[in-house]
């Protein structure tokens, strides 16, 4: 397995902690977020990880040089310019093997996902006649922004249910209004489509990386890339119905995150 950890973010929602350190080194249960994600990936079988850096990049580099994980870890340096999630993958693409998917994991996400199984599905799907160009881990979590999938779980678009905005290359989705899925039946179809929340964990195949390299532009979100190309490339969603996920993006979520890891580690 090869993987990438998004650790370049500014961590503005974790201020004042991130006034003096990168979000990746904020501790949950006495361990930095970066350490937790690296160990999760290593335990899942990752032998090579790329970590992108920007905010207080030297602290992350020093941390990785000081702590040995027994696997190959490379740095993708965005110190001069933050490239956003899609641009970050594009910059780091040359550091990966070109014949297998890359598992992407946000540094501030804690979950109960079986990463080895998820990566296996991405790899297996990539070898079929209907190859999957990216596999996105999604769930029925309540939010305001959802990815829109066909009944067969192919990515079709994105919507903000608060504003009614829809982004999609498919004309059939234009003008449709979606609602927050029902708590009692969150997997029900709306206008023939599923709505699921993105988890910040996904696997991108070499075919999609090649398309990304052919595009102009260096700074762009990965979701925008997926939406631009979901008509010609096969981006699939994988639903984990019992997903337990913590987005450790706000000061107020740290105590909840500590309880989350204590429960998982008990």
In which residue ranges do the predicted regions lie?
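Conserved N-terminal catalytic core of the sugar/cofactor nucleotidyltransferase
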Residues: 1-5, 27, 31-106, 115-117, ...
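Catalytic-core segments of class I nucleotidyltransferases/pyrophosphorylases
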Residues: 100-103, 110, 116-127, 142, ...
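Conserved beta-strand segments of alpha/beta enzyme cores
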Residues: 24, 72-74, 234-236
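Active-site metal-binding loops of divalent metal-dependent hydrolases
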Residues: 10, 107-109
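A short, conserved acidic/glycine-rich loop-to-beta-strand motif
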Residues: 127-140
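N-proximal low-complexity "stem/linker" segments adjacent to membrane-targeting elements
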Residues: 1-16, 25
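A generic "binding-loop/recognition-motif" signal
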Residues: 10, 21, 56, 79, ...
